């Protein structure tokens, strides 16, 4: 019997027993044909790979991530995935959808077609994430119907505005969920439900949302699994308590590991989903259980029954490892073809621009002046009690503090205060909205930074301690049609150009990685103390992440789902 390939003398991971079994693997037409002890006596392989006792595990599968968080194109992202053993992903392009609507989703899918890694897409469900921001595009019910006609769609992406879902039966997202339940009753619906417990948690499950990838605690996981919810565990949730819970309880079918957002420098220097797998093992989880949570359970969650296991009829995506402790990848195979080998050079083949011309002209803002960073108050007012965003290290959550800020000649004297200014400017040419706030905590203490990479609306966000630096940073980003720029004493310290929709670079991974690291170092030199400064910066405009954020509509009290004024009454 002729086979395309026989991999002999290997320890094969059996997903159904969650253990390794010594044997051989025959592959035909990109699929596993036989796993067992037979070899040359039964098969006539075109190629023979001597496994030399190595470990064969399925290609890793990441079912919750956003390519745009890495600031690179799908082709560059795929290049990074393969060398880290990730052969299948489910990206949710709500960042590009916020900029361009359905065309953003379609172009991301199109750009993924020739990638080595398989990409099955989630339809962005919450674009915009709330009604309290202006975006370049939106995803409506008609758009969902249109996208459902493509074979690349596998689920409805994370329902982010959970507060509206459980409090407002007539909100847009509830209409989308009702439409999905009626027209596509078998479609998987992904969730984003931080801190929900008890009745509120079960309300969101009743709405059809049955997974959560946000920060997990033991209490939260226990409640979710008990209610039938699937848990997608990011690295930030991998505490000792969480890993111990997963080790000690029979919940293997109810969780998997996901990356969600990976910055380019981390992707380049640390890795991807393989990082979480190795970390779980280092924290005491058995290699078999960790592999299972990165292969079989994510495949089952997304009903990708053709992969996630090494068994007859399954897609022949697999890795060869020399040991299970370090999880060092020696070879990666995609549909039975060798696509990466650690002993050989691995160079990305760059392509010409992949997106329509208007994707490179998305920042529709005139250059700013210092006056754009003024906060006007009544001339008779000598000071005002103000809300202040407090940035907390180690979290994208913020808190709200209050202080009295002096005023002079009808302007709030924020430059003389101990606080920075945070301002956002609508950049799609729709309404000219702008909003100002004050900021403190583990954020930059001098200079300025401006960015169009600002979740999820991706308007121009500027933070600084003086108007001149803020103006220079903002205008540099406007001139480059998007990016992140850091300025101090009138000089540009670092810049990441992001010309595709103001959020993506077409440079190769190693170049963008160096740019991200340089910008990170620059921001830290100005006092930004967060462990992931770019992620912290970009989520200050995310109105579904507690507690006080800012959009072009104003300051947002996330927990109450409403805008609140910067200046407060003395009685407040």
Predicted segments with their positions:
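Histidine/acidic residue-rich metal-binding segments in metalloenzymes
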Residues: 138-157, 164-257, 268-282, 289
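Short, ordered loop/turn segments at secondary-structure junctions
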Residues: 93-96, 124-125, 161, 194-195, ...
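Structural motif
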Residues: 4-5, 46-47, 87-89, 117-120, ...
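Metal-associated gating/positioning segment near the N- to mid-region
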Residues: 38, 42-43, 48-114, 468
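Short acidic, glycine/serine/threonine-rich loops at helix termini
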Residues: 100-104, 130-136, 167-171, 200-204, ...
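Active-site neighborhood of phospho(di)ester-bond hydrolases with catalytic His/Asp-centered motifs
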Residues: 57-64, 91-94, 122, 157, ...
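Active-site microenvironment of metallo-dependent hydrolases
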Residues: 1-23, 27-33, 38, 82-83, ...
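Divalent-metal coordination cores built from histidine and acidic residues
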Residues: 78-188, 492-497
């Amino acid at each position: 019997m002729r086979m395309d390939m026989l991999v002999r003398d290997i320890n094969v991971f059996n997903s159904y027993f969650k253990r390794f079994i010594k044997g051989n693997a025959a592959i035909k037409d990109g699929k596993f044909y036989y796993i067992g002890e037979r070899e040359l006596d039964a098969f006539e392989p075109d190629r023979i790979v001597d496994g030399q006792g190595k470990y064969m595990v399925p290609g890793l599968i990441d079912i919750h991530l956003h390519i745009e968080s890495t600031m690179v194109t799908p082709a560059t992202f795929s290049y990074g995935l393969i060398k880290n053993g990730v052969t299948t992903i489910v990206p949710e392009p709500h960042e590009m959808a916020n900029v361009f609507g359905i065309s953003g989703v379609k172009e991301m899918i199109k750009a993924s077609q020739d990638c080595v890694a398989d990409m099955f897409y989630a339809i962005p469900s919450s674009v915009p994430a709330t009604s309290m921001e202006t975006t370049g595009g939106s995803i409506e019910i008609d758009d969902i119907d249109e996208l459902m006609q493509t074979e690349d769609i596998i689920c409805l992406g994370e329902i982010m505005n959970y507060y509206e879902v459980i409090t407002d039966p007539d909100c847009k997202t509830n209409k989308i969920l009702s439409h999905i339940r009626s027209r596509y009753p078998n479609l998987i619906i992904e969730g984003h439900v931080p801190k929900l417990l008890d009745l509120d948690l079960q309300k969101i499950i009743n709405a059809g949302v049955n997974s959560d990838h946000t920060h997990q605690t033991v209490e939260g996981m226990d409640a979710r699994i008990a209610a039938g919810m699937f848990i997608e565990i990011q690295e930030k949730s991998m505490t000792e308590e969480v890993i111990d819970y997963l080790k000690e309880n029979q919940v293997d079918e109810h969780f998997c590991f996901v990356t969600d957002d990976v910055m380019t420098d981390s992707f380049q220097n640390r890795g991807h989903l393989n990082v979480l797998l190795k970390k779980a093992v280092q924290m005491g989880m058995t290699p078999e259980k960790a592999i299972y949570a990165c292969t079989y359970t994510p495949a089952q969650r997304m009903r990708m029954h053709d992969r996630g296991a090494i068994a007859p009829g399954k897609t022949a995506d697999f890795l060869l490892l020399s040991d299970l402790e370090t999880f060092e990848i020696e070879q990666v195979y995609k549909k039975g073809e060798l696509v990466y080998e650690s002993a050989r050079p691995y160079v990305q083949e760059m392509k010409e621009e992949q997106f329509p011309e208007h994707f490179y002209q998305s920042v529709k803002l005139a250059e700013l002046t210092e006056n754009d960073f003024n906060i006007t108050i009544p001339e008779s007012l000598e000071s005002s009690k103000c809300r202040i965003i407090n940035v907390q290290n180690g979290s994208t959550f913020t808190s709200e503090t209050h202080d009295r800020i002096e005023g002079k000649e009808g302007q709030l004297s924020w430059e003389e205060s101990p606080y920075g200014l945070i301002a956002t400017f609508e950049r799609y040419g729709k309404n000219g909205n702008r909003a100002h706030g004050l900021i403190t905590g583990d954020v930059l203490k001098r200079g300025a930074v401006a960015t169009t990479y600002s979740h999820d609306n991706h308007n121009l966000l500027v933070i600084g301690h003086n108007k001149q630096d803020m103006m220079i940073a903002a205008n540099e980003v406007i001139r480059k049609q998007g990016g992140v720029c850091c300025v101090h004493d009138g000089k540009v310290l670092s810049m990441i150009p992001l010309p595709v929709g103001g959020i993506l670079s077409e440079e190769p991974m190693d170049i963008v990685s160096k740019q991200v690291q340089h910008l990170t170092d620059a921001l830290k030199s100005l006092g930004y103390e967060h462990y992931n400064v770019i992620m912290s910066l970009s989520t200050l405009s995310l109105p579904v992440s507690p507690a006080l954020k800012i959009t072009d509509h104003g300051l947002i009290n996330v927990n109450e789902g409403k805008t609140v004024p910067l200046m407060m009454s003395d009685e407040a």
